[in-house]
Amino acid sequence: MLSGKKILSAVLSAALLLPAASALAEDDAFAAEIERRYTAPSIDSRSEVRWWMAEAGHTDETIRAEIQAMYDGGFRGVELCAQGEDEISEADYGYGSAQWDHDLKLAMNTALDLGMTVSLTSGTNWATANVPGLDPHSQGASQIVVDIVEYIKAGASRSGAIPMQKKVGSKVYPIEPTAKLIGVFAVPQTSGNKAKPIVTDGTGIIELTDKLVWEADGTITLDWTPENAESKYRLFYYWQQGAMQESPPAAETAYCINYFDEAGIEALKEYWLAHILDDEALNAKIQAGDVQLFMDSLEISTEYGCAFWCDDMAEEFLARKGYDIRPYLYLTIGLPDLFYWDAVDYGSYDLADKTMREKVLNDLFDVQTQLYRERMLEPLRAWLHEYGIKTRAQISYGQRLEISEPIMSVDYPEAEILNQNNQVDMYRLWTGGAKLQNKVLSSETGAYGGYAYTEQDHLMEAYNLFAAGFNRIVWHIWSAQYGPG
């Protein structure tokens, strides 16, 4: 017979085992849930994939089949982009054609019906926001500063017609009849002509704009003799005109919009309203789904010019920085390509006062960053939100713009493997701003090695991204089973 103490001890032991058994059951349930999430993730936890479509060269059946294959393959969403094919007529099947509009909407409907996300590039191709048939000379199209340079040796003067074309190698670019004069400036040169860069005196710049004479025959002349006969000068003629940056494939030539003036966004709106948002049934699906406008790497180009511009760039700069930027525009000539983060921060010309050069260029790129946000990213985002569409953008690397502030002006910031070389330290240029804004950060992943990738290569890229603080992967790229036809 058990004593009272033994009975009490047995009861207490059993009572102690009950919470332990309960905890073990909870641990098993938690482990099972974690395993389920990894082995059978919900659609919201999956990665996405981009599909560069061969213009409108697919049949309805193959479009449906490809989208279904993406869904069955475990992808959360699809990013759609028009790409050119040599054997396909751009006029009939390119971006902006009736057939392209049909194919794009069919792909969107199919994906949205499956509960997938859909992203649309901001134009044909991936490089820019562009519009087929846009007047390249209008303020809605990308505008640049075209620079023409003359050398005035010591003791010399100049007279007669001013040069009206720019030579770049064997090519000649005329100043268009629609071009607008920005200004003419004489800059003292303090180094020899063979110096790289040519050094100048930023404190002795002389404006000559008011000395220009428009003759009756349309010729523009300038007569000027330097007061200091011992100085040599560079004369810079600055004109604003369209960059005429094209993006194929399109039914009409598609020109890059102006990223620094809201006229560019107005042109983009007109296209979207006429070609994408003109279907009420699809618009209802967009409102209920997850649709994004996607801006890929910012590959806008000054073409043969030296800087981006808009009608009131000089006025905006003066209001924000307190001085005239026009006399210093020559400092933007020949600046190196920043796609791979070149450390050199001077171009063909420099100032004797390098601190002044650094300040001037930083001020210019700060103002342009502000205009990029205020006149492009933010009004575009506000307008698209009316239709239930979010914005996703590979923020401003590759250009002389600040790369963290624009994160505030999009819904989803993005980086890419190709430019950042899958380096965690480079990714931090994006993760800091994204975390401060508490925004989902994605990456275009798999763009570096093409078909040379192994599965382990893909995994390593993904691991690096997640370790760096990224939340979302968009794989580059979907290989369609069916070719055009």
How should these model regions be labeled?
Residues M1-V11:
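Bacterial N-terminal signal peptides that target proteins for export
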Residues V11-P19:
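Bacterial N-terminal signal peptides
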Residues L18-D27:
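Sec-dependent signal peptide cleavage junction
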Residues A29-P41, R46-E48, H58-G73, G77-E79, ...:
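Mature extracytoplasmic enzyme cores
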Residues S47-M53, D86-Y93, S247-D261, R357-T369, ...:
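Glycine- and acidic
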Residues R50-E61, Y448-T454:
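Active-site mouth loops of central-metabolism enzymes
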Residues D103, D353-K390, Q399:
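Active-site neighborhood of glycoside hydrolase catalytic domains
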Residues A127-N130, Y387-G485:
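Hydrophobic targeting/anchoring helices
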